[in-house]
Amino acid sequence: FGLGQTVTSGIISALGRSTGNADEGYQNYIQTDAAVNQGNSGGPLINLKGELIGINTAIISPSGGNAGIAFAIPSNMANSLVQQIIEFGEVKRGMLGIKGGELNADLAKEFGIDAQQGAFISEVFPKSAADKAGLKAGDVITELNGQKLHSFSELRAKIATAGVGKDIELTYLRDGKIAKT
């Protein structure tokens, strides 16, 4: 239509959302019904106070047009990435070197884990940061730098945006006992 500076509802329907692509590097989106179409991602998602809360990034749509499901990177995550670009000229994603998934009631019961939420580790890659820190398959990471983790995707997003070579502290459960790296 050739119109600029438009506003849509942009109701937030979920936080910590995944687009469904497990291979994607970022999985902690804000889900909104803002009218985002192919080619106009990158615009701001703002709250009622006019504060930036996210950067519109992706949509789920069979046609490529607005279907009422859009995703935004939270502004605090975007800020971290911008700082890396300023400092290094590129984004350098942190990596633990683990595979895993969300801790759910069935998984907790199967492995005898006394936790309701966290990041379940199914595999630790040899010589990775996780391996060097002593993490093992079956551990459940419950905190990152003293902040509770609710899911594997949250851990993945926070590690990815923490930057390379940064020291972090992980709290985890192993055999019913709490430990820290």
What are these regions (language model features)?
Residues 138:
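Conserved catalytic motifs of ABC-family nucleotide-binding domains
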Residues 1-133, 143-167, 173-178:
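Serine-dependent protease modules
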